Amino acid sequence: MGAGDYIVTATNPVTGEMRSNSIKVISLIESDDLTKYYKNASQFVVRIHSADGGYVGAGEDVTFNINGVFYTRTTNATGHAKLNINLRQGNYTITTYYKNCSQGNEIRVLPILSADDLVMKYRDGSQFKAQLVDGQGKAYAGQSVQFNINGVLYNKVTDNDGVAKLNINLMAGQYIITSSYNGFNTANKITIRG
């Protein structure tokens, strides 16, 4: 039986008397969904129950499947197994397997660098701005963000609000700008009207 609530009904074949009871089957896998920022130290953590309701000790193999890739980790002394999450921004489903049990959870990886498309007039003084946050979602000052526009690279340092700014002095047209920090990239469009 999988984890869940069940009703079991017993019938006396002689008298036809019926009696029902509720049964709750608890998963051996204890886990929660995870929301984290790109490349921060947060891990996906599960705790494994033993058949008697306690927790297993060290040395039990637990398998994780995320994006079709399987990883096996071993429980520690308190029954925890941990998996580092080094995925790009997005939503993922992770499935944990232990013995005959499986359990699914959601992992959400948040961006550390974000920006909006820019529409401007030729040489109107507009700047392209990218917001950088640290692994806890707080403004990340004093960091170098790289901008790539038309194959030309610019490095700008974030201010106290975590914002890196690039002056735009291009001819009228549409351009793709890529902002990068620590392996994270985000692309935006700049539209310049004459």
Where do the protein language model's features map onto the residues?
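Solvent-exposed beta-strand/loop surfaces, strongest in extracytoplasmic domains of secreted
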Residues: 1-194
